Design a protein with these regions (language model features):
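Glycine-rich phosphate/diphosphate-binding loop of Rossmann-like nucleotide-binding domains
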Residues: 8-25, 29-31, 151-224, 236
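Glycine-rich phosphate/nucleotide-binding loop
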Residues: 51, 230-335
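Glycine-rich phosphate/pyrophosphate-binding loop and the adjoining helix
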Residues: 136, 142-188, 192-195, 315-320, ...
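N-terminal beta-loop-helix "entrance" segment that forms/cooperates
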Residues: 35-59, 230
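Buried hydrophobic packing segments
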Residues: 23, 27, 206, 300-308, ...
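Short glycine-rich or small-residue beta-strand-to-loop segments that form or flank ligand, phosphate
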Residues: 6-15, 73-78, 186-192, 305-309, ...
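Buried hydrophobic positions in well-ordered alpha/beta secondary-structure cores of metabolic enzymes
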Residues: 13-16, 70, 132, 174, ...
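N-terminal glycine-rich phosphate/adenylate-binding segment common to multiple enzyme folds
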Residues: 50-157, 245-247
């Protein structure tokens, strides 16, 4: 008897409330078509209105509520006019990533037919790579402090944290992913010519890990020139692995090079499956367009496809569902309807319904 996967669906803020229903609509259709065993529960917290009412982003027992799920399907968080971003993010999304040890962040980058590319002369097939970001340590630590506030001697100190365990496990994941891809190529982002302690350590661990994967062609590139090459030579990349900060930058730049962040998905994984993994669009909550019904749901839907592939863990039904959703997305982008960010006039629901119809 096959396992029933439990999914917690959390809309969050802003357009998360608009795109999540379309993602759920597609998941329900995929479950029917490919006989998937999914149990979805919608939870109404981890958003700024909840904070305004309760003084915190999530209930005290959030960990206990969520730990029994297999995945979290998340919209977006943040509404800075209501709650400062550092409160909303550290009180929800970053808690999920760290407390559930979702140390791998995966962000695929692909240029689809029908999406206008801002890079001259690029066509579908030229841009198809994956950014692997370390998701739990690195530059985004809470280690630091502020002293002598209000005086001319005021200073702040923010520390980065790179552990051998943390660095090695993200590098291992990236090299193993590269082994599954036809090009078998990996690029490691660094800045060891300017950051004199943590980045040389990152380089050292990368070289040691690479020695275990002799079939992988790899190189390291400093983050500044790497960003330039994303724009100038995106076709040279296959798997790109980076620290938390550098991965954050690259995984927004990549989709922008492919035309729009509006269709970019991400996965926050605990590869060992001890805790639920989280799947979300790269785009934020976009309060400025909330309520206009023009948010592109494709990133949410594509994130759902990533979730099915991860949950299936080799099950052909779940892989077929992932591939089928991606094919439907490609057709809708090429044939319409599409939302204004892609140059169309379709609504959020128009796009969601069209993808369901394609399935």
């Amino acid at each position: 008897m096959s396992k029933t996967f439990r999914i917690a669906a959390i809309a969050g803020d802003g357009i998360g409330k608009e795109v999540l229903p379309e993602g759920l609509r597609v998941l329900e259709q995929a479950a029917k078509k490919w006989q998937l065993d999914l149990s979805i529960e919608v939870l109404d917290w981890a958003h700024c209105d909840y904070y305004l009412e309760h003084g915190q982003m999530m209930p005290d027992d959030w960990f206990e509520q969520l730990k029994g799920f297999d995945a979290i399907y998340f919209g977006a968080v943040g509404w800075p006019d209501k709650v400062p971003d550092h409160i909303s993010l550290w009180g929800s999304l970053l808690k999920f990533r760290r407390d559930f040890d979702q140390y791998v962040n995966i962000r695929p980058v692909r240029l689809f037919p029908g999406v206008p590319c801002p890079l001259a002369g690029r066509k579908p097939g030229d841009i198809d790579f994956v950014v692997i970001r370390e998701n739990t340590e690195g530059e985004y630590s809470s280690v630091g402090g502020k002293m002598f506030e209000g005086t001319e001697h005021e200073f702040v100190l923010q520390e980065s944290v790179f552990t051998r365990r943390g660095v090695d496990r993200i590098l291992k994941f990236a090299f193993e992913l590269a082994q599954t891809r036809p090009r078998k190529r990996l690029t490691a982002a660094t800045k060891s010519n300017g950051i004199s302690i943590s980045m040389p350590y990152w380089d050292e661990r990368t070289a040691l890990m690479a020695a275990q994967y002799p079939d992988i062609t790899w190189d390291k590139q400093h983050i500044d020139i790497l960003c330039a090459r994303f724009v100038l030579q995106p076709d040279r990349f296959d798997v790109v692995v980076a620290s938390n900060l550098f991965g954050d930058i690259l995984s927004d730049l990549g989709p922008a090079c492919a035309g729009t962040i509006g269709i970019a998905p991400s996965a926050n994984l605990d590869p060992e499956r001890r805790f639920p993994s989280l799947f979300e669009p790269v785009h934020g909550s976009a309060p400025d367009i909330y309520g206009k019904n023009i948010a592109n749901p494709i990133a949410m839907i594509w994130s759902g496809a990533l979730m099915l592939d991860f949950l299936g863990n080799g099950d052909e039904r779940y892989r077929a569902a992932h591939d089928g959703i991606l094919q439907a997305i490609e057709r809708v982008i090429a044939e319409g309807p599409i939302t204004p960010d892609l140059g169309g006039k379709g609504s959020t629901q128009d796009v969601g319904r069209a993808i369901v119809a394609m399935l």
